[in-house]
C-alpha cells in the first residue's frame, strides 16, 4: 500500500477531481473519484474525540462548499502575475504553465541570469543558418566572435552583425534653417544622396545628404506644399500644393516638366505608381475636392497627358480624400476619405478602375498603407473611430482584422495618458519592413505594435508627450521604426523587444521646442531627415559630422522669394529677370535676414565652386520695400568693369551720391552706411567674412522679412546670355540611378506587380464565403453631366486671381455662367479631365510675395469644397469636362444607348446672399414647438411600437430618391431577428447634420408583460419624408387604437395637415402577407373624396356626436385647439415626478425667466440668427435655446420630465460641439445646463437663483489645487537652459528675487527681444481696417497688393465677430512705459491676449500666422516664466521681512499704508469693493458708457445663442476677458469702425473718499461679493496698518497661486482655460459691464471702476477697453484657408490679411440706477459666480496639432451604426476631448469664421 498522501497532495487530488467534474471529462472524473476512495487518498475527518474516520468524496465536497469547481484553475491563473512581481518573465503578458527558463512558474533568480555564448557557439549552424540568440542574451554579442564565426561559416545573422543597440550611435549632424515657414514634407531621392523639403513658404528645396549643402530651390507654387513624391526612376519630383496644382520638375536640371491642373481644391496626397508595365507610368493625386486623378506620363520622354483619368468620390458635400497608398507592385492603390469609406482601384487593366468600397470604419479614415511585399494583398487602415484594420483580399472580398486601440497588454497597468483619453483615435499606421507587425499611433501618445497575421497586441511603446503623426519603418531592418510627434521628440524603437533605443528632443534655443512634422529614412538606412514647425531640416546619421560643420546654420538663396509671373498654363518666370527660375545664374547664399554669407560659404552654391573671390562677393544695393522704406539687399553678383552695363553703373553712382548727401545733411537713413566704395563705384562689404548673427539686421526694422523681400529691379548685367543658358542647362542637380541598379529595381517591381495580379485573379475565382452585395457606386465609365462652364473670377484679389480684370473679363466674357453653378454638383463617377481651356494670355505680374496663402481653404473638413468666407459667394463654376478615353466614339455610342443619367443638383452651404441653403437648415419637424400627432418627434423615455414594415418602406424611399447613402447591411433586420412589430423604448437620441438632418435612435427592447428592458437594443436612423408613414408609434396611441376595434363600414376622421378629413373603413387585411399579424396599414379606407388608401388604426379617430362636417363632401375642416390638445399624449403617473405636468411646466417656465435675468444665460436666450451666421446649421444638428424650451413648456410639448432634461442638456452639447471644450462659452453653457437640471430635478425648489448659488458654493476651490500643484513647474528651469548659463546669471537672478519692482525692467527687455523677432511683425501695431479689408483676411491676399479703391471698410464688422479684446505690442509697450501694470501677471495677460486673439481669429491651426504665433508664444513664455518666478520670490521675501516693521507701523500716526499697493487680485477672496489711491487710466474692457447708450439699443442687440469658436488660447483668450464693447459713437457711420484708444502716460489719482461715478454722475452699480456689507464694515473698523498687512498677505497668496498657474500655461500652445460669468459667457466681473475699467486689469476678479479721462479737442470722452478698440493685428491678421492632409497628417492652412474690429458685447455703465433692485440682485449673483469660476482660469495648454488632426467631421457620423452609440445614462456622450469632456468639435466652425457672440 502506498504511503499516505500529504495534506497538500490530498487536497490537490480533490481539486483535480472537482476541475474534471466541471469540464467535459466527466468519465475521467468518475474514475479518479473511484481511485481516490479505493486508495484512501481522500483526507480523513476527525470526530469530537479526535478519532479519524474515512469519508466519501461527496462528504468532502459538502464540507468544502466554499470551494468552486474551477478553484484550481483560478489558483493557476494567479500564480503567474504574483511571480512576475518577484522575478519578471522574459516575455511580459504570456501566461503559461508549461514555460521553461524565465517563463517557468518554478523559476528563481538563478534561472534568470543572462546567457553568454563562447565563440564556438556562434560558429555553429542550425539547418544551414546561424543560431538565434536566446531571449535572455542581454548584451550584444562580441563583434570579434561574430567576425570569426562569419569567417568560418561564411554567413551570419544581421541581428548579430548589427545589433539594435548600434542605433544608439546615430546622432544629429546638423540642423539647418532653410525655410521661413513650417516644413511638412521631406523625402530622399532613390539614391539617398539628395533630400527634398517642401514647406509652407511655397518652396521645394534640394539638399545634399552627405554635407547638407543647399543645391537648388524649386519655385512655382503659390501656396503651401502639401505632399511630394520622387519617381522610381529618380528623374522626376512632383509636388502638390494648396493652390490645387501639381507641379513636376526634372531632377537632373530642375526644369519644370508639367503643371497639372485637375483638382478644384487643395492636393492632399501625391504618389508615383511603382508599376513598370510598358513605357506608360502613372502619377496619382488626391484632393480635398473628393477626387483622385491618374496622370499618365511617358517614361522615356517624360511627357504628361493633360487630361487625367479622374474619379470623383463625393458621396456627400465636403467629402475629401485624405490619404492614399500604392501596393508594392503598383497594381492597386487604396484611398481613405472623410466619409469613412476606403476605396480600392486596380491598375492592371487598360485604364484604372475602382474595384471596391469598404465601409467598415465609423469615422474618418486618416491613414492607409499597403504592405511592403507583394506576396499578399494586404493593407492597413487607421481611423478616428479608434480602430485600425488589416485588410486582405480573399475569396472575392476584402476581409479585415480589427485592431482596437483600447486593447491593453495583459499584465500591463499603464495609466498615463491612455486612461485620460476617452475617445481613442488612430493618427498614423505603418508596417515593419517585412510586414510581420503593424504599428499604430494613437492620440493617447502611445504606439502599439500588433501581429499582422493574428491582430494580437505585442508591445505598447510609451515616451511621447503629444500626438504622433510620423511613423517611418527602416528600409531593410525590420526591428527598427522611427516615430516623431508634435512634442518635439524623435524616437528610434526596437520592435522585437518593444524598447526605446534612442531619442532626440528638438529643443530650439530661446524658442521652446519645435514640433516634428515629417521624417524619412534614406534608402541605405544610414541617414534620416526630419523637418519641424520652425522651418528646420534636421539631418541624422552615423559617423562624424565634420562635413556638416562646414556649412552655415541658415541657408537661403537670395532669389528664393522673388516674385514670379505666370502664363495661362501656370508656368512661371522670374519677374525681374524674365527668365525661368532654373535658368537663372547661380544665386548667392544668404541667411534668414537676407544678409549674404561669407565668401567661404558662397562656394557651396552649385556653379560657384570655382569662382574667384571677387565673383563671390554679392552686389549690394538699396531698394524700396513694400512699406516705402529703403533697405539694403543683395541685388546680384559683382562684375568686372568691362562686363557691367552702363545703366548699372549709373544707378550705383546715383545711389552712392544720394547716400553721401544724406550723411552730409545729417539725415542718416534707416540702414547703416558703413560700406567702402570700390574703384568702379560698386558697393563692396569689407566685413564679408563676419557672419551675421540671427534675429538682427534687416529684421530689426520690423518692416521687411529678410530673404522674403530681395529686390524689385535686377540689374541688366544679371540677364543670362545664350552661352550661360547652355552651361546652366547642363548642370546636374540629381543624378539618375545607375543603369544596373535601376534595371534590378524595375525587375523587382515588375515581379511584385505580376504576383499581385496573380493573387488577385486566383482569389477572384474562388467561391465567396457569402453572397457578395452589389456595390452601390456607379461604374467608372459614365460621363460627367456637369455643364460646360468656365471658372469665374471673383471680384477680390487672391494669389491665384491676380490677372488684370480688364483682360480677364474680355477674354472670358463669352463663357461665364451664373454664380450658382456649383462644384458641389453631383456627377457620375467617370473618367474625365479638368484641363482648363483658357485662351493664351500674356504674362502677368504676380505682385504678391510667393509665400502668401492659397486662394481657398482645403482644410474644410466636411464643410464643402471651395468654401468661401461667410456672406460671400461660396461656390465656383466648374470647368468643362471631357472624356479622356482614346476611343471617344465608342464610348459616345455606349452613352447614347444608355438612359440619360440625371441627378439632383446639390447646392453649396451658403447662397450668394449669405443665406444658408435650405437643405442645410434643421427641418421644421425638429424645430416645431407645438406638439403634433404626426410626424412623430422622438423624446427620451418614449415607449413605442416599432414597425419593421414601415422602416423598410422608409429605407426603400430613401434609396429610390437617393437622398443619402443607406447601407443595407447595417439595418437592424439584417443584424438580428426582428418581428413585424416590437415593443421598444427610446434610450438614446442623436441628430446628425445633413442634408438631410437625420435622427438617430437607440431603441431598447421591452418585455411586453412586465414592461421592463430586456437588455437588448438596436439603432436606427430616419427623418421625416413626405408620403412616408411613421413607423414609430407611441405605445399609448397604439393601445387606444387597438381598443377601438374598427369594423367594416365604420366612419372615421383623420388629421392631415392640421385639418380633419373623413372616410369609411372598407376592409381589414395585412399590408403584406409575410406579416399577417401586423397592424401597420391594415385597413383599406375610402375617403369622402372617392380616394382609397391603406391606413393604420392609430391614424384614425372616431367621429364624436355633434361634429360639424364640411360644406362640400370630401373637403376638410380645420382642427380646433381643443381637439388637438385632446389627441395629445397623456402623461402617465410618475412621468412628471410628484407633481402634475401643468404644475411642473409652470414652475420651470418661471425658473427659466429668472435664469434669463442672469447675464451669463443671455447668450442662450434666443435661436441663432442664421442670416448673420449661415454656416451654424452645418455644425449643430439640433439647435435649441432657452426661449424654445420655454415655448415648448407653454405648449406642453414634452411628454415627460426626462424629455425636458434631455433638451436642456443639448444646450451644453451644442456649445461643446461648436467650441473648444475649455472655452468660456462652454463653461457658461455648462452652468446654465447644470443649474436648470438641478432646478428641474428638485421639485421642491421654487427659486432657481437659490439653486444657482448652491452650485457655486459646492466647488469654490476646485482649481486652487491645480494652482498649487503647478507652482513647481514655474520654479524649475526650462529645458534647454545650460547649467553654465544658469550659474552665470545666478547672482543677478538672486538680486531680482529680492526686488519687487525688478520685473518692470525685465519686461521691457523681453518686449525689446520680441520686437527683434520677425514673427512679431504682424502684432506690433493695431490693424487698420482701411488697409486690411475683410476679403484679404479671408482669402489670404497681401494688403499691399490691393488698390485703395478696392478695399472694403467692413473689416470691423467681421473682426468684431472673432476678437472681443483687441491687443497689440504697441499698446502693451505704452502701458508698460506709463506704469499702468501693477504686476508682471498683468503684463503676461495682455501679451497672452495678443496670442489668444491670433489663434481665435485664425481659422486654421497650421497657417503661417498660426505658426508665427506659436513660435513667438514659445519664446515669450520661455522668458516670462523666470520673470514671474522672480516676482513671486520677491513678494514672498517682502512678506518675510514685513513683520520686523509691524510694531513700528502700528505706532505710526498714519492710517494709510505707504507701501506698494497690493496685487489687484489680492482681495478676490475678500469679495469687497475697495477704491484705491492709484487708479489706472488705461483703456477698459467694458462696454462704453456713451451718452448714446440706451435701453432700446441695448435690447436691439439681440443676444444670440451663437457660440464663440475659440481656438482655445489659455486664460487670456479673447473670449475670456472681453467686455463685448461697442463703439460709443455708433450713430456715426463713419466712426462705426474700430479705433485705437490712447493710453495716458501716468495714472490718475482719485480720492478714496469719493465714490466712483459714471458719465452722468450717478454712482455705478457695485460688483460687491457675497459678504459685501460685513466685509466693508470689517474694513472700516480695521486699522490702516492691519489693512495693509491683510492686503499684503492676500497679495502674496495670489502671487503664489497665479504664478503656479502660469507654470502650466507656459507652453507653445494654449486652450481656453477661463471660466466665465459675464453677459456673454459670464467671463468678466459685472464691474466690467457697468463701469469703466482699466484695460490692463481686465482679468482681475476684484471689482473696481477705472475712471478715465481723455481730452481730445477740448472734449471729454469716456472710453472703456474694447470700446472702438482697433484690431491689433498688423500685416497678416486673420488667415482663413485650410491646409491639407496626407496619410493622416493633414494640417490647416491659412489666409492673409488683417484688420481691427470694435469690441463687442453689452455693458450698462451709466445706466445702472435705472433698473432697480432686480438688477442689483442679478449683479450680485453674477459676481459671485464670476468669483468662483475664475479660480480655474489657467489650464494646461495643448501643443501644436497636426496636418490631419485639425480636421473634424460634421456630416454623417456613423457612430450610430454601432448599437452602443448612446449611453443610457447620458445620451449626449458623443465623444470626449483629451480632458475627458464630451465634445464633437467641427472644423466648419473655424472655416466659417463664426468668432464671437451674435449681438
UniProtKB/Swiss-Prot annotation:
Compositional bias, Low complexity, is annotated for 845-858, 1333-1348, 1451-1463, 1517-1530, 1598-1623
Matching InterPro entries: Bromo_WD_repeat (IPR052060), Bromodomain (IPR001487), Bromodomain-like_sf (IPR036427), WD40/YVTN_repeat-like_dom_sf (IPR015943), WD40_repeat_CS (IPR019775), WD40_repeat_dom_sf (IPR036322), WD40_rpt (IPR001680)
Q: Which residues carry this modification: Phosphoserine?
A: 693, 884-885, 1574, 1576, 1760
Q: Where is the Bromo domain?
A: 1136-1243, 1298-1427
* Entry's Gene Ontology BP terms: cytoskeleton organization; regulation of cell shape
**Superkingdom, according to UniProt?**
Eukaryota
Q: Where is the composition biased (Acidic residues)?
A: 817-828, 1260-1276
**Comp. bias regions, Polar residues:** 795-816, 875-884
What keywords would UniProt list here? Answer: Bromodomain, Phosphoprotein, Repeat, WD repeat
Q: Composition bias, kind Basic residues: at what positions?
A: 784-794, 897-907, 1438-1450, 1646-1663, 1681-1694
Where are stretches of biased composition, namely Basic and acidic residues? 1584-1596, 1624-1640
Region described as Disordered: spans on this chain: 766-912, 1258-1291, 1321-1366, 1435-1482, 1517-1723
* Keyword DNA-binding listed: no
UniProt WD repeat ranges: 170-209, 213-251, 255-297, 307-347, 353-393, 400-452, 456-495, 502-542
What is the role of the protein in this entry? Answer: Plays a role in the regulation of cell morphology and cytoskeletal organization. Required in the control of cell shape.
This chain belongs to the protein called: Bromodomain and WD repeat-containing protein 3
What species was this sequence derived from? Mus musculus (Mouse)
Amino acid at each position: 500500500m502506498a504511503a499516505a498522501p500529504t495534506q497538500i497532495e490530498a487536497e490537490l487530488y480533490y481539486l483535480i477531481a472537482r476541475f474534471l467534474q466541471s469540464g467535459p471529462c466527466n468519465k475521467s472524473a468518475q474514475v479518479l473519484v473511484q481511485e481516490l476512495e479505493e486508495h484512501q487518498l481522500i483526507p480523513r475527518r476527525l470526530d469530537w474525540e479526535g478519532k479519524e474516520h474515512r469519508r466519501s468524496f461527496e462528504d468532502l465536497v459538502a464540507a468544502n462548499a466554499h470551494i468552486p469547481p474551477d478553484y484550481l484553475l483560478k489558483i493557476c491563473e494567479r500564480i503567474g502575475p504574483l511571480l512576475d512581481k518577484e522575478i519578471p518573465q522574459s516575455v511580459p503578458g504570456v501566461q503559461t504553465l508549461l514555460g521553461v527558463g524565465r517563463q517557468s512558474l518554478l523559476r528563481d533568480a538563478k534561472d534568470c541570469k543572462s546567457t553568454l555564448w563562447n565563440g564556438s557557439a556562434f560558429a555553429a549552424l542550425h539547418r544551414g543558418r546561424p543560431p538565434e540568440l536566446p531571449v535572455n542574451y542581454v548584451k550584444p554579442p562580441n563583434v570579434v566572435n561574430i567576425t570569426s564565426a562569419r569567417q568560418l561559416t561564411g554567413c551570419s545573422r544581421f541581428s548579430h552583425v548589427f545589433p539594435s543597440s548600434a542605433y544608439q550611435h546615430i546622432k544629429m549632424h546638423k540642423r539647418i534653417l532653410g525655410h521661413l515657414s513650417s516644413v511638412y514634407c521631406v523625402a530622399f531621392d532613390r539614391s539617398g544622396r539628395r533630400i527634398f523639403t517642401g514647406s509652407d513658404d511655397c518652396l521645394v528645396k534640394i539638399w545634399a545628404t552627405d554635407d547638407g549643402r543647399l543645391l537648388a530651390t524649386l519655385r512655382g507654387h503659390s501656396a503651401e506644399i502639401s505632399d511630394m513624391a520622387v519617381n522610381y526612376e529618380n528623374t522626376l519630383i512632383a509636388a502638390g500644393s494648396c493652390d490645387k496644382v501639381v507641379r513636376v520638375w526634372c531632377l537632373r536640371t530642375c526644369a519644370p516638366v508639367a503643371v497639372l491642373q485637375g483638382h478644384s481644391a487643395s492636393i492632399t496626397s501625391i504618389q508615383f505608381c511603382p508599376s513598370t508595365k510598358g513605357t506608360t507610368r502613372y502619377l496619382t493625386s488626391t484632393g480635398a475636392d473628393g477626387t483622385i486623378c491618374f496622370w499618365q506620363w511617358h517614361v522615356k520622354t517624360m511627357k504628361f497627358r493633360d487630361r487625367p483619368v479622374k474619379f470623383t468620390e463625393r458621396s456627400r458635400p465636403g467629402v475629401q480624400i485624405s490619404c492614399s497608398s500604392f501596393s508594392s507592385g503598383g497594381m492597386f492603390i487604396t484611398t481613405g476619405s472623410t466619409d469613412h469609406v476606403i476605396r480600392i482601384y486596380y491598375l492592371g487593366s487598360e485604364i484604372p478602375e475602382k474595384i471596391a468600397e469598404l465601409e467598415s470604419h465609423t469615422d474618418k479614415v486618416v491613414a492607409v498603407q499597403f504592405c511592403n511585399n507583394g506576396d499578399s494583398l494586404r493593407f492597413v487602415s487607421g481611423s478616428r473611430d479608434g480602430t485600425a484594420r488589416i485588410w486582405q483580399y480573399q475569396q472575392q472580398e476584402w476581409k479585415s482584422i480589427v485592431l482596437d486601440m483600447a486593447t491593453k497588454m495583459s499584465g500591463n497597468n499603464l495609466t498615463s495618458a491612455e486612461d485620460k483619453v476617452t475617445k481613442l483615435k488612430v493618427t498614423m499606421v505603418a508596417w515593419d519592413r517585412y510586414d510581420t507587425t503593424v504599428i499604430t499611433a494613437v492620440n493617447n501618445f502611445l504606439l502599439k505594435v500588433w501581429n499582422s497575421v493574428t491582430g494580437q497586441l505585442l508591445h505598447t511603446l510609451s515616451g511621447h508627450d503629444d500626438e504622433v503623426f510620423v511613423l517611418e519603418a527602416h528600409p531593410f531592418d525590420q526591428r527598427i521604426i522611427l516615430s516623431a510627434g508634435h512634442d518635439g521628440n524623435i524616437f528610434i524603437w526596437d520592435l522585437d523587444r518593444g524598447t526605446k533605443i534612442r531619442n532626440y528632443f528638438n529643443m530650439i534655443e530661446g524658442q521652446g521646442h519645435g514640433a516634428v512634422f515629417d521624417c524619412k529614412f534614406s534608402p541605405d538606412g544610414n541617414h534620416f531627415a526630419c523637418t519641424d514647425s520652425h522651418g528646420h531640416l534636421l539631418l541624422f546619421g552615423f559617423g562624424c559630422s565634420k562635413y556638416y560643420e562646414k556649412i552655415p546654420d541658415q541657408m537661403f538663396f537670395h532669389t528664393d522669394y522673388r516674385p514670379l509671373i505666370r502664363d495661362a498654363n501656370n508656368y512661371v518666370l522670374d519677374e525681374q529677370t524674365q527668365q525661368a527660375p532654373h535658368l537663372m545664374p547661380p544665386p548667392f547664399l544668404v541667411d534668414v535676414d537676407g544678409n549674404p554669407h561669407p565668401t567661404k560659404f558662397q562656394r557651396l552654391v552649385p556653379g560657384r565652386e570655382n569662382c574667384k573671390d571677387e565673383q563671390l562677393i554679392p552686389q549690394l544695393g538699396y531698394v524700396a520695400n513694400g512699406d516705402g522704406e529703403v533697405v539694403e539687399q543683395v541685388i546680384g553678383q559683382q562684375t568686372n568693369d568691362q562686363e557691367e552695363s552702363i545703366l548699372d553703373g549709373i544707378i550705383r553712382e546715383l545711389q552712392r551720391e544720394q547716400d553721401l548727401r544724406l550723411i552730409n545733411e545729417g539725415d542718416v537713413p534707416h540702414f547703416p552706411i558703413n560700406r567702402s566704395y570700390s574703384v568702379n563705384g560698386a558697393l563692396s562689404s569689407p566685413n564679408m567674412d563676419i557672419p551675421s548673427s540671427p534675429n538682427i539686421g534687416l529684421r530689426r526694422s520690423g518692416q521687411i522679412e529678410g530673404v522674403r523681400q530681395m529686390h524689385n529691379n535686377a540689374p541688366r548685367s544679371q540677364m543670362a546670355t545664350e552661352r550661360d543658358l547652355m552651361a546652366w542647362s547642363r548642370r546636374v542637380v540629381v543624378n539618375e540611378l545607375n543603369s544596373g541598379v535601376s534595371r534590378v529595381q524595375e525587375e523587382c517591381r515588375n515581379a511584385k506587380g505580376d504576383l499581385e495580379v496573380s493573387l488577385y485573379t486566383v482569389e477572384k475565382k474562388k467561391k465567396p464565403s457569402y453572397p457578395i452585395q452589389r456595390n452601390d457606386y456607379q461604374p467608372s465609365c459614365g460621363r460627367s453631366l456637369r455643364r460646360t462652364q468656365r471658372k469665374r473670377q471673383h471680384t477680390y484679389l487672391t494669389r491665384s486671381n491676380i490677372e488684370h480684370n480688364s483682360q480677364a473679363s474680355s477674354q472670358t466674357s463669352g463663357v461665364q455662367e451664373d454664380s450658382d453653378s456649383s462644384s458641389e454638383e453631383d456627377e457620375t463617377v467617370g473618367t474625365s479631365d479638368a484641363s482648363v481651356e483658357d485662351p493664351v494670355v500674356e504674362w502677368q505680374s504676380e505682385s504678391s510675395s510667393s509665400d502668401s496663402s492659397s486662394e481657398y481653404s482645403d482644410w474644410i473638413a466636411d464643410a464643402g469644397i471651395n468654401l468661401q468666407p461667410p456672406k460671400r459667394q461660396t461656390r465656383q463654376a466648374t470647368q468643362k469636362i471631357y472624356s479622356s478615353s482614346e476611343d471617344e466614339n465608342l464610348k459616345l455610342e455606349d452613352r447614347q444607348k444608355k438612359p440619360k443619367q440625371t441627378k439632383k443638383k446639390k447646392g453649396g452651404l451658403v447662397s450668394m446672399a449669405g443665406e444658408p441653403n435650405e437643405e442645410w437648415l434643421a427641418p421644421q419637424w425638429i424645430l416645431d414647438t407645438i406638439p403634433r400627432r404626426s410626424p412623430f418627434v422622438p423624446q427620451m423615455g418614449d415607449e413605442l411600437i416599432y414597425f419593421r414594415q414601415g422602416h423598410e418602406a422608409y429605407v426603400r424611399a430613401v434609396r429610390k430618391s437617393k437622398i443619402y447613402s443607406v447601407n443595407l447591411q447595417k439595418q437592424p433586420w439584417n443584424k438580428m431577428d426582428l418581428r413585424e412589430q416590437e415593443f421598444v423604448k427610446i434610450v438614446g437620441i442623436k441628430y446628425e447634420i445633413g442634408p438631410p438632418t437625420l435622427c438617430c435612435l437607440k431603441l431598447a427592447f421591452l418585455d411586453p408583460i412586465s414592461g421592463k428592458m430586456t437588455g437588448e437594443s438596436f439603432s436606427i436612423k430616419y427623418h421625416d419624408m413626405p408620403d412616408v408613414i411613421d413607423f414609430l408609434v407611441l405605445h399609448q396611441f397604439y393601445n387606444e387604437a387597438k381598443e377601438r376595434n374598427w369594423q367594416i363600414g365604420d366612419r372615421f376622421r383623420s388629421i392631415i395637415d392640421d385639418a380633419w378629413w373623413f372616410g369609411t373603413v372598407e376592409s381589414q387585411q395585412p399590408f403584406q402577407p409575410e406579416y399577417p399579424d401586423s397592424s401597420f396599414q391594415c385597413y383599406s379606407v375610402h375617403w369622402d373624396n372617392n380616394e382609397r388608401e391603406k391606413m393604420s388604426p392609430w391614424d384614425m379617430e372616431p367621429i364624436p356626436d355633434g361634429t360639424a362636417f364640411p360644406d362640400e363632401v370630401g373637403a376638410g375642416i380645420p382642427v380646433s385647439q381643443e381637439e388637438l390638445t385632446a389627441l395629445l399624449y397623456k402623461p402617465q403617473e410618475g412621468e412628471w415626478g410628484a407633481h402634475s405636468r401643468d404644475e411642473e411646466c409652470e414652475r420651470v417656465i418661471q425658473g427659466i425667466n429668472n435664469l434669463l435675468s442672469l447675464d451669463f444665460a443671455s447668450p442662450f436666450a434666443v435661436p441663432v440668427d442664421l442670416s448673420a451666421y449661415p454656416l451654424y446649421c452645418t455644425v449643430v444638428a439640433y439647435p435649441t435655446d432657452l426661449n424654445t424650451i420655454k415655448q415648448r413648456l407653454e405648449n406642453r410639448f414634452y411628454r415627460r420630465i426626462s424629455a425636458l432634461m434631455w433638451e436642456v442638456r443639448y444646450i451644453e452639447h451644442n456649445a461643446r460641439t461648436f467650441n473648444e471644450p475649455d472655452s468660456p462659452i462652454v463653461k457658461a453653457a455648462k452652468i446654465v445646463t447644470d443649474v436648470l437640471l438641478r432646478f428641474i430635478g428638485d421639485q421642491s425648489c421654487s427659486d432657481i437663483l437659490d439653486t444657482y448659488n448652491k452650485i457655486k458654493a459646492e466647488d469654490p476651490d476646485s482649481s486652487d489645487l491645480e494652482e498649487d500643484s503647478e507652482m513647481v513647474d514655474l520654479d524649475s528651469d526650462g529645458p534647454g537652459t545650460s547649467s553654465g548659463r544658469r550659474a552665470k546669471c545666478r547672482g543677478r537672478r538672486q538680486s531680482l528675487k529680492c526686488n519687487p519692482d525688478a520685473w518692470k525692467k525685465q519686461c521691457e527687455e523681453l518686449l525689446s527681444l520680441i520686437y527683434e523677432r520677425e514673427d512679431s511683425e504682424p502684432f506690433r501695431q493695431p490693424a487698420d481696417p482701411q488697409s486690411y479689408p475683410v476679403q484679404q483676411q479671408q482669402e489670404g491676399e497681401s494688403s499691399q497688393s490691393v488698390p485703395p479703391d478696392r478695399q472694403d471698410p467692413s473689416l470691423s464688422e467681421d473682426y468684431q465677430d472673432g476678437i472681443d479684446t483687441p491687443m497689440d505690442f504697441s499698446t502693451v509697450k505704452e502701458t508698460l512705459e506709463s506704469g499702468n501694470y501693477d504686476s508682471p501677471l498683468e503684463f503676461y495677460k495682455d501679451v497672452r491676449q495678443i496670442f489668444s486673439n491670433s489663434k481665435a481669429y485664425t481659422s486654421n491651426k497650421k497657417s503661417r500666422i498660426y505658426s508665427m504665433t506659436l513660435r513667438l508664444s514659445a519664446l515669450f513664455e520661455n522668458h516670462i516664466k523666470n520673470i514671474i518666478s522672480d516676482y513671486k520670490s520677491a513678494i514672498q521675501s517682502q512678506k518675510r521681512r514685513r513683520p520686523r516693521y509691524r510694531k513700528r507701523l502700528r505706532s505710526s500716526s498714519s492710517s494709510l499704508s505707504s507701501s506698494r499697493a497690493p496685487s489687484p487680485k489680492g482681495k478676490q477672496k475678500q469679495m469687497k469693493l475697495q477704491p484705491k489711491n492709484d487708479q489706472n487710466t488705461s483703456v477698459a474692457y467694458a462696454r462704453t458708457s456713451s451718452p448714446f447708450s440706451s435701453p432700446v439699443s441695448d435690447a436691439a442687440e439681440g443676444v444670440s445663442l451663437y457660440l464663440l469658436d475659440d481656438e482655445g488660447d489659455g486664460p487670456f483668450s479673447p473670449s475670456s476677458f472681453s467686455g463685448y464693447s461697442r463703439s460709443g459713437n455708433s450713430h456715426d457711420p463713419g466712426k462705426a469702425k474700430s479705433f485705437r484708444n490712447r493710453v495716458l502716460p501716468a495714472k490718475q489719482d482719485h480720492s478714496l473718499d469719493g465714490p466712483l461715478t459714471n458719465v452722468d454722475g450717478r454712482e455705478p452699480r457695485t460688483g460687491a461679493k457675497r459678504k459685501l456689507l460685513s466685509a466693508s464694515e470689517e474694513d472700516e473698523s480695521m486699522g490702516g496698518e492691519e489693512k495693509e498687512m491683510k492686503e499684503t498677505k492676500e497679495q502674496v497668496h495670489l502671487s503664489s497661486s497665479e504664478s503656479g498657474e502660469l507654470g502650466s500655461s507656459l507652453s507653445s500652445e494654449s486652450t481656453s482655460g477661463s471660466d466665465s460669468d459675464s453677459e456673454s459667457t459670464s467671463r468678466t466681473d459685472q464691474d466690467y459691464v457697468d463701469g469703466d475699467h482699466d484695460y490692463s486689469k481686465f482679468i482681475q476678479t476684484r471689482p473696481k471702476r477705472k475712471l478715465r479721462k481723455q481730452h481730445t479737442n477740448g472734449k471729454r470722452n469716456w472710453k472703456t477697453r474694447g470700446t472702438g478698440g482697433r484690431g491689433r493685428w498688423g500685416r497678416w491678421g486673420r488667415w482663413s484657408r485650410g491646409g491639407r492632409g496626407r496619410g493622416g497628417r493633414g494640417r490647416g492652412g491659412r489666409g492673409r490679411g488683417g484688420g481691427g474690429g470694435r469690441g463687442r458685447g453689452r455693458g450698462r455703465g451709466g445706466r445702472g440706477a435705472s433698473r432697480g433692485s432686480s438688477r442689483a440682485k442679478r449683479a450680485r449673483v453674477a459676481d459671485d459666480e464670476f468669483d468662483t469660476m475664475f479660480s480655474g482660469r489657467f489650464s494646461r495648454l495643448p501643443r501644436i496639432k497636426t496636418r490631419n488632426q485639425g480636421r473634424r467631421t460634421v456630416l454623417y457620423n456613423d457612430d450610430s451604426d454601432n448599437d452602443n452609440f448612446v449611453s443610457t445614462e447620458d445620451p449626449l456622450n458623443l465623444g470626449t476631448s483629451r480632458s475627458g469632456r464630451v465634445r464633437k468639435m467641427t472644423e466648419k466652425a473655424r472655416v466659417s469664421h463664426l468668432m464671437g457672440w451674435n449681438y
